[in-house]
Amino acid sequence: MKIGTRAVDLPCLSNRFAAMSDLILHHYDFSNFAEKVRLALGFKGLAWHSVIIPPIAPKPDLVPLTGGYRRTPVLQVGADLYCDTRLIVRELERRFPAPTLFPPAQAAMADAIAYWAENRLMRPITLYTSGMNLDHLPAGLQADRSVMRGLPPPDDATMRRAALRNAPLVRAQLPDVESMLADGRDWLVGPLPCVADLAVYHPLWFFTARTELLAHELAPYPHIAAWMSRVRAFGHGRSTAMAAARALEVARNTEPLAPEPSTPWPEDPPLGAEVRIRADDYGRDVVSGELVHAGIDEIVLRRDDPLVGTVVVHFPRLGYDLRAA
């Protein structure tokens, strides 16, 4: 596959699609974090099943799988559920290492850029674009997002004021992205595309995910425009629609993978303990279960649900608060 001006070797798609069909992505169309994963699936040439979930609570067909976690997206492989794109993309890399999204020479810088993009860059973009596109948002979306952050639901005037406050914070950072590409490079960190390209792309994609109203904010940046075209060319792989009930059935009829061996830190609860985990920023719904893996990068809980039986839910270590039940 040719991406931009450099060749990136992708696997032979016709030989791999059938084998990858156990990947199930729970997502919705205008989720920017879901777009990050969809592009990762495309970059790696994978086939996957698409389960569309509501953008707001309740999510009755998702929470039996995750135990309460309701952020988007969630990757399901049999009876294993992977939460948070930081972990999802790494799990795709572990299962399908070629072509890599983590070139060793670029990995440390890529992680640093991804953290900036998905925190300091994305938050003001979200507030700016949401406040300026109020007429195009699903009913109840802003109230739902406020609940996820423990805030009272905002009225339209409050949202518009937030948009105006955050517009300068967005404009202050866009030149940084343009400058990363100003030397003519194709990708942000080095000669190869990597996870940093996905992490910076999806907040900028959010400008026009619903409407073209704010497309003018990106217009002054030709390097960004060309780079976004290269990332967009990854595509989304090949998806097949799946009913939510079928995804529940898959989990119910599949044994989860045995957890990888791990040695928890002394401060962690011991393996086998009943624990609680939740995100440390927003969407802090608690998931409870038995701790079966506590590694440097990943926390894994085993839990039982009357609808799906035994499932295993995976979280990244960073960004999550793990405690004894």
List each model region and its residues.
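Short linear/disordered segments characteristic of secreted peptide precursors
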Residues: V8-L10
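GST-like domain detector, emphasizing the conserved glutathione-binding G-site
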Residues: C12-V147, D156, R160, P269, ...
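GST-like fold's C-terminal all-alpha helical module
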Residues: A117-A233
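Mixed-charge, Lys/Arg-rich low-complexity intrinsically disordered regions
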Residues: G237-L271
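A short beta-strand micro-motif
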Residues: E274-D280
